[in-house]
Amino acid sequence: ICFQSLILDMAGNVGTQSLAVTIRVLMDENLTASDKLKLTVKEMKVGFSNGILLGVMAVIFVALYIFLIKGNDIAYSFIVSGCVGFSLLASMVISSLIGTLVPMFFNKMKIDPAVASGPLITTINDLVAVVTYYCMVWLLLINMLHLT
């Protein structure tokens, strides 16, 4: 639970940024399906790149925190921090995808994506981040490694 806010905040930031970029691109009326696909892939690449960078940083700093401050052994520290880092990566990629697809969906339905997308993106990204984090903890730490 200690690192839940880190994952939630970063997923929210990435999703909101993807939302802003997508809404700006959707202002072009001549946007083709190919352009939308390219935008989606580009935003996922950005989310993945940011997720890798921040995930690695999270692994290092969380492991140091658990090892030095909490006094656990180094293997345990890196196992737990790896779970945090991977959850951060996964939630950032998924949030960037959602932040791109939701405004496209609203635009297709003839609803202004700038008005309708914000609260929905925030809620969905929070849910995705929490579910991703707890699923990783459940899969990696509890089921596979029997750490509780």
Per-range role (PLM):
Residues T122-Y133:
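Alpha-helical transmembrane segments that form the membrane-embedded catalytic/substrate-binding core
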Residues A114-G118:
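Active-site-proximal inter-transmembrane loops
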